[in-house]
Amino acid sequence: FPGSICASVNDQIVHGIPSNSVILQEGDILSIDTGAIVKGWVGDNAWTYPVGKISPEKKRLLEVTEQCMWAGIDAARPGNHLGDIGHAIQEIAERAGYGVVREYVGHGVGRDMHEDPNVPNYGRKHTGVKLEPGMVIAIEPMINIGTYKTKVMSDGWLVCTRDGKPSAHFEKTVAITA
């Protein structure tokens, strides 16, 4: 990735490359996705912030997406499965009428930023890899006001909503503990 962080604005879901040509405006939402390496171990985190006063529609999107992340984290317990995490996220997002991005998902985290297993933001309870103590995963719902469908822009990095509607992204790296 050519940037130090990912900075994605409004309908940009992930992998926005920071640029001096992008001027934030009152009412925008800005997702910042960062990683860190400490003593050879990786951490990954994202948060979506309001720029000044935002519309009630965008405020609700941020609130629901953050709720999705916390519900996914709550489901990340030994003995549960990846499908339990995805189901918890999907249920909240779709109940709110939002689209759950499917092409981009959470992931295992360790010595590398993206390791197995993939951690989808959608799924069925009691399916997928069983969660065991010692696993470290990034749970990162990407939720769209409109459709879940995405498009990759011409730079080959930036991913936007296909319908141009806003998207929010919240992420935490969590360890599964006994």
Please name every model-derived segment.
Residues 1-178:
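Active-site neighborhoods and metal-handling regions in enzymes and metal-associated proteins
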